């Protein structure tokens, strides 16, 4: 899932969610698509085109399209950045549940999101990759988990102290 939603303006929500299958010549399972659209909270928008959706709704359509795919490795680039706090938490929970048996590479600029969702955290900086945290289950961590706040603080300290921390 790219940071930009990459929705097709001429296609409605259901057609956009089925895009991967259509590109593979499989047509797409519209029943499954409608179930996934319901899971992301957009049932009432399923026949709308992207230009009539908000940025957060568009991002949820892109997430629904990703949820439709049964791949062993999932790449998510800032998948929750356009969402309000409540919807972000709900979509993080949904993604964590749906992708629990898959390898997920999550790109985020949000240390709280990384601590809540990730088993391993790596910092990409100055063309290098550094492992900075290995976390234990459960995932996703509860948003009121006090240990999560301590881990987030520790992560921010490590980010600030890392080489090249100057902007």
Predicted regions, residues:
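Helical segment within the ABC ATPase nucleotide-binding domain
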Residues: 88-100
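Catalytic "switch" loops of ABC-type ATPases
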Residues: 3-8, 101, 110
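Conserved ABC ATPase signature
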Residues: 49-53, 57
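A short, proline-enriched helix->beta-strand linker immediately N-terminal to the Walker B motif
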Residues: 68-72
């Amino acid at each position: 899932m790219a940071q930009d939603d990459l929705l097709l303006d001429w296609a409605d929500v259901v057609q956009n969610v089925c895009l991967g299958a259509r590109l593979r010549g499989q047509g797409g399972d519209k029943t499954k698509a409608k179930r996934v659209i319901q899971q992301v909270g957009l049932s009432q928008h399923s026949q709308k085109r992207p230009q009539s959706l908000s940025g957060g709704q568009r991002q949820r359509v892109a997430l629904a399209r990703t949820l439709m795919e049964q791949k062993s490795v999932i790449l998510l680039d800032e998948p929750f950045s356009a969402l309000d706090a409540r919807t972000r938490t709900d979509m993080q929970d949904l993604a964590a549940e749906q992708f629990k048996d898959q390898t997920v590479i999550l790109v985020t600029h949000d240390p709280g999101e990384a601590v809540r969702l990730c088993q391993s955290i790596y910092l990409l900086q100055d063309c290098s990759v550094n492992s900075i945290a290995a976390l234990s289950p459960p995932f996703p961590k509860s948003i009121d988990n006090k240990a999560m706040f301590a881990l987030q603080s520790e992560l921010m300290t490590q980010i600030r102290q890392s080489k090249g921390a100057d902007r």
